[in-house]
Amino acid sequence: MSMFLDTAKISVQAGRGGDGMVAFRREKYVPNGGPWGGDGGKGGSVIFRVDEGLRTLMDFRYNRKFKAKSGEKGMTKGMHGRGAEDLIVFVPQGTTVRDAETGKVITDLVEHGQEVVIAKGGRGGRGNIRFATPRNPAPEIAENGEPGEERQLELELKILADVGLVGFPSVGKSTLLSVVSSAKPKIGAYHFTTIVPNLGMVRTKSGDSFAMADLPGLIEGASQGVGLGTQFLRHIERTRVILHVIDMSASEGRDPYEDYVSINNELETYNLRLMERPQIIVANKMDMPEAQENLKAFKKKLAAQYDEFDDLPMIFPISSLAHQGLENLLEATAELLAKTDEFLLYDEADLVDEEAYYGFAETEKDFEITRDDDATWVLSGEKLERLFVMTNMERDESIMKFARQLRGMGVDEALRERGAKDGDLVRIGKFEFEFVD
């Protein structure tokens, strides 16, 4: 049996490292001062942290982009730029993080307080003080900051509804769910309108959010497997609060109180613990004729079943179609959830083994060579492109250093083997230069 799945697609971008600085020491009594440019600060990483207080991924529907700050540039006197703070993103317990492009699982976040670096901040570029050598004591070389990692992610949260809607078919459960959430269940005036559970994420005006399930309609005999009863009951046993929806207009010709007793009998027959869940009675269709009189009769019959010292179940008169009484119902539901402990969450049958891919690093290719239609040689590859973006192309010494790095990686030799000749154009990104054999 599948669980409900809440999903969200987001983008994360770690901060860029600060650029290194080219600077020289110039003080009155220090002739021929050497390099004095400091390193750039590291970029902030994007870190996911588990918060057991979160129940849904609803917050990611409103905020889909997460970008950490960049590190500051290096300064004179060899001082490093300030590193950027990491961006902490809170996620619910049980969140699975996938790479949206490959579909691979990056990590499973299962423990409260667990942290995972989802996008690593870029390294700060080195200042010219780092490149001083006996042969070149005054280098005019500094690195640009390394770009931070950028990822498109898909978050999945296997969840079970906090709140379950129970009641006879056609009492208005699907309509209620569609009104208070973004769920779009199929709605019709016939029995077993809902044949599979529908899930909606509900947010109250006070900012609380919870998952509400509209479950397959229940009939007498469900606990013995009649109709869709077994499927219904296996879902409802995992909820923490039950909203018992009753058609107070009696439009189907049934007595509202008899409906209430019948449904509770099925819940008790299937599993005694179901009756331990706090239950709110939702008196629906109060905009219809006869509803007010039926509600009075219902309350009278209900009170007769309780001792004078017992607390009666809460009753909220509403009309889903007319949008009446919904705000008070949702606030009361959120308050009840806050003080209700969790019941059974998972069966062994619910747990799906799937291959997980942890970490980000795959085998990194140094470079690749292709040729455009205009005969330009095109260089690409993660390592090569990272070296390129960290090279300050406005300084000759930095360009010469980059050329030596390419030679050391074997790029020159590979171009010769592919047939490159002296004077051929070579392109990296938007930067073009001539190949010198």
Swiss-Prot record:
Domain OBG-type G span(s) in chain numbering: 161-338
Annotated localization: Cytoplasm
CDD domains associated with the record: Obg (cd01898)
Keyword set, alphabetical order: Cytoplasm, GTP-binding, Hydrolase, Magnesium, Metal-binding, Nucleotide-binding
Enzyme Commission no: 3.6.5.-
Keyword rRNA processing: no
Residue ranges of coiled coil: none
Domain OCT: 359-437
Cofactor entry: Mg(2+)
GO MF annotation terms: GTP binding; GTPase activity; magnesium ion binding
Record-annotated membrane-spanning stretches: none
One cellular component (GO) term of this entry: cytoplasm
Binding site for Mg(2+): 174, 194
Chief localisation class: cytoplasm
HAMAP family: GTPase_Obg
Record's function text: An essential GTPase which binds GTP, GDP and possibly (p)ppGpp with moderate affinity, with high nucleotide exchange rates and a fairly low GTP hydrolysis rate. Plays a role in control of the cell cycle, stress response, ribosome biogenesis and in those bacteria that undergo differentiation, in morphogenesis control.
Family recorded in the similarity comment: Belongs to the TRAFAC class OBG-HflX-like GTPase superfamily. OBG GTPase family.
Subunit and interaction comment: Monomer.
Protein name according to UniProt: GTPase Obg
Organism encoding this protein: Streptococcus pyogenes serotype M6 (strain ATCC BAA-946 / MGAS10394)
Gene: obg
